[in-house]
A protein has these predicted regions:
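Sec-dependent N-terminal signal peptides
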Residues: 6-18, 22
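GGW-centered surface loops in extracellular recognition modules
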Residues: 35-46, 307
Length: 360
């Protein structure tokens, strides 16, 4: 009987050992230590550790700008309820960060706080959050949607974060896969960087109550082809459509009275349609002239410095072939160069002479 009992126990132990070997054991992650954090009072200034899972120490009230920036080893972050503010770019370019756990108590997330976190695939807003800055998720290409949870100050629909009443469009999730977006008619304001880097977006219809297209709003939307601009829009700000390389024909209504010089930088295929004598028509004429000059002089212009003895200072100069200078004289008014190129050096027949713009 004793031998039989021993055999049974032996068999049980063997079976148990076999079962245990098939159960995957959890891999322990490297976690942060108190010494890994540089502090100034209740502000976390900088993280110096190498852990993959980071827990911000209790008692911290503010995470300073760029405190965790470029920390590619971090995969998880836990932020306690004591933290009220996450500073600008605090976790910028943490490219392997996949999970962020925020606690109720957080009030403010500043601009670009999680920008460039390309592995981040989920995010939940605390119910206490009151303010979220521009481009918080810019470049987070894995982020298709977020959860606003019990927060009553924000709303969310179709991959887009708005304020509570949808009067302000705050940000389109970078991983949103839809190719079109019809902006709600309630929208009167777009946050800077709201559409930045949207890879899938091809067509946008703006709200008929929108008054301005702000800085960098659609910058780097490389596949954007069509934008419908309503008569409510008065201003198109700097870099608003920068590097939208596939943006084709676009109609800008006469209601737009201000277009920044850089609004359409890098839009190689753009053709603006506008009414006669409108700000948009004037902008397009100047843009086309600049494109012609840029194409003509791209390989022939050299920029250097010229020392003017009369006022004893260096001035910026541009070396231009004589034939090109003749074309420029015919095409452009002199005032266009007064602030851009104070002196022009013209090489001809083996020697160079210097001329002021007024002498040309």
């Amino acid at each position: 009987m004793k031998k039989y009992g021993k055999r049974v126990i032996g068999v049980i132990l063997m079976v148990l050992a076999m079962v245990l070997t098939q159960i995957p054991m959890p891999v322990l992650e490297a976690t942060s230590a108190t010494a890994d954090f540089e502090r100034d009072g209740d502000t976390l200034i900088h993280y110096t550790g190498t852990a993959s899972a980071v827990s911000v120490p209790a008692g911290i009230r503010e995470i300073a700008p760029e405190a965790f920036a470029d920390q590619n080893g971090i995969t998880k972050v836990y932020i306690p309820s004591s933290v009220e503010k996450i500073g600008e770019g605090a976790f910028r370019n943490c490219t392997n960060l996949k999970e962020v756990s925020l606690s109720d108590g957080l009030i403010t997330i500043e601009s670009g706080a999680f920008a460039g976190c390309s592995s981040l695939s989920g995010f939940t807003l605390p119910k206490t959050l009151e303010t979220i800055g521009a481009g918080v998720f810019s470049g987070d290409t894995a982020l298709k949607s977020i959860n606003i949870g019990k927060n009553r100050l924000f709303s969310y629909a179709d991959g887009v974060l708005y304020d509570r009443d949808q009067a302000k469009l705050i940000e389109v999730m970078p991983g949103r896969e839809a190719e079109t977006l019809n902006m709600p008619t309630k929208v009167t304001d777009i946050e800077r960087y709201a559409f930045w880097g949207q890879e899938h977006l091809k067509e946008v219809t703006l709200s008929p109550n929108l008054s301005e297209i702000p800085e960098y709003a659609f910058s780097n939307c490389i596949n954007l082809q069509k934008v419908s601009i309503p008569y409510s829009v008065r201003k198109i700000a700097a870099k608003a459509f920068e590097d939208c390389k596939n943006l084709g024909n676009i109609t800008i209504p006469p209601s737009v009275t201000t277009i920044h010089d850089t609004a359409f930088d890098g839009c190689d295929n753009l053709k603006i349609r506008a009414e006669d004598d409108s700000a948009a028509q004037i902008f397009e004429q100047e843009r086309e002239k600049n494109q012609v000059v840029s194409a003509m002089l791209q390989d022939d212009v050299a920029v250097g410095n010229f020392y003017n003895k009369q006022d004893a200072r260096y001035r910026e100069t541009v070396q231009v072939p004589v034939i090109m200078m003749s074309i420029i004289r015919l095409m452009f008014p002199i005032w266009m160069f007064q602030n851009i190129m104070p002196m022009i050096r013209l090489p001809f027949w083996g020697r160079q002479e210097s001329y002021t713009i007024r002498q040309l």
